[in-house]
Amino acid sequence: YEIGANYDTRKFGFVIDLANVGKNYYTDMGFVQRIENYDALRDTAIRVGYKHIFTEISYNILPTKGKIGRIEASAQNSIIFNPDNSLNEWESALNIKTDFKNASSLKFELNNNITNLLFATSFTDGIPLPAKQYQYATFGIGYGSDTRKLFGWMSEISFGQFYNGTVQSFSAGINWRSQPHLNLRLNAQYND
């Protein structure tokens, strides 16, 4: 089952979503990523259900003067529980996004994750990470140019931790907009 609620005003927003997905759930189309868990030590996939709680609260500041059109501050929590109600994953995020009156934007985001790996996991051909609790955080900043123009661009940089290591990421993109018929975007991302 899944149930949710949403409340929005000009300045304030709130979202809550609750879900319970059993290991025997199969979608009619696509797939549910979290059900299939890969055990790198046994080289097999194990189906595990989950319970999910997502909340987001946001607040908008709408200046009447100056170059800023809107400042949005938001906080998100996504908590995943195992079928026995033990914690599987908890992701918290704080975001500040500034939309300028010229349709460009600037954003800052801070993410904190707590992940309890149920099974040894490998992201590379190296030694699998052991099944245990990991806590890691990332910080990112991004800018997007005026979206109304024929050509636009965006870039984002983030850095922090990832499981037992560090991560640095840079992404950039260009956009060609010929409304109402065409909107073409080319993105590139580098992760280290």
Regions found by a protein language model. Give the residues of each.
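Exposed, low-structure sequence patches enriched in small/polar residues
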Residues: 1-192
